[in-house]
Amino acid sequence: MLRRDKKRESRIARERVFYLIKRAEEWKNIDYELARRYVELARKIAMRYRVRIPRELKATYCKKCLYPYKAGKFRVRVRKSRVIITCLNCGFERRIPIRPKRVNRKV
């Protein structure tokens, strides 16, 4: 019985997740349902192989309905300590905290 090469599996899974989300970005203006399916598959692969999806890629689709954000389909509001992205498809609000820049002071 062969042993699983987990590093290789996770590398392939990470590449596949990046590819699927990139394809979703390309297809979101053409076939919205297909773009949503690509995001769904990317999330399933990431969960199956326990691969993290980077924050920059997570911010490109709705967490609830998995539709990629498209012009006119989401609203962005900036508050003091956070950015609020509202999906106009399902109404889900994603709140992204903004951390103030730290000033390094030498005493």
Curated annotation (Swiss-Prot):
Reactions it catalyzes: Endonucleolytic cleavage of RNA, removing 5'-extranucleotides from tRNA precursor
Keywords per UniProt: Cytoplasm, Endonuclease, Hydrolase, Metal-binding, Nuclease, tRNA processing, Zinc
Predominant place of localization: cytoplasm
EC number: 3.1.26.5
Cofactor binding: number and manner: Binds 1 zinc ion per subunit.
Assembly notes: Consists of a catalytic RNA component and at least 4-5 protein subunits.
Protein name: Ribonuclease P protein component 4
